UniProtKB/Swiss-Prot annotation:
Alphabetic keyword roster: Amidation, Amphibian defense peptide, Antibiotic, Antimicrobial, Secreted
Residue runs in coiled coils: none
Keyword Secreted: yes
Entry protein name: Aurein-3.3
The organism's place on the tree of life at top rank: Eukaryota
Annotated disulfide bonds: none
Chief location category: secreted
Length: 17
């Protein structure tokens, strides 16, 4: 769902840090 996409993006940001 949409929330899954948000979580995926958030996880990508965390990984980028």
């Amino acid at each position: 769902g949409l929330f899954d996409i948000v979580k995926k993006i958030a996880g990508h940001i965390v990984s980028s840090i």
